[in-house]
Each structure stands twice: as structure tokens, then as C-alpha cells.
Amino acid sequence: MLTKIGFGLDPALLRAVIKTESDFRQHAVSHKGAVGLMQLTPATSARLRVNDAYDSIQNIRGGAKQLRHLLTLYQGDLPLALAAYNAGVHRVKGGKVPRIRETRSYVKKVLRYYEAFRSHPKPSSKHEKK
């Protein structure tokens, strides 16, 4: 499923972001009001035209679209794109991950999960088309 809706992103990367953002809980809500698997804020959901951020497909599609945009903006620099996904583009300056403890921890955690998921890929579902 992630391959089909992930805007060309590695499914292991999307799983790593989802694991970090919501621990795979579809109805997760943050203290800042971000919701769903990829923790989209209401403003981000509106900008990405996600009508129901609790819907797994819409949420992943929106989060993947945002992450793809950030990777393009930061010329493929994954740590910077992840920092912007977490803290906002306005906080990622000078080509460096901002000195925000939560953001630095977030980037490290996603990268750690990404490596783990790449090393041990999830077997495809029998319902997923190859």
C-alpha cells in the first residue's frame, strides 16, 4: 500500500515516520492538534487537501506529499527534510537541523527506524498488488 500512495518515497521511510509520529495509531492526536498516522496539523491537512486526516490513506498520502516537497526543497537532504517535517520550514535555517531537542531527537529516531525497516523489510500483504 505505501508504495502506491507514497509519492515515490521508500516505504521503509514512510513506516519510520509513521512509527515515530503515531506508533502506527490511526487515531492518534498530539497535544498540538496533529492527527492520524503521519500527524498532520489542521493547517497542513487543509493545504494538502486532506479531507479526513483520520483516514489512513488520505493521511499517508498527505504526509508523503509533504515529505516529498521537503526533500525537494532541501535537495534530498533527509535529516533537514525530517527536521522541517517536525519543526516547520521556518526553523530549518543555514542547512542545519535546528537546535531544538525534540527535533534533533525526532530526526535521530526516524533515521534509526528507517535503517531498521530497510534492513528488515515488512513482507508484502497478500492483498497488496505487486
Regions found by a protein language model. Give the residues of each.
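Catalytic glycan-binding domains that act on GlcNAc-containing polysaccharides
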Residues: 1-130
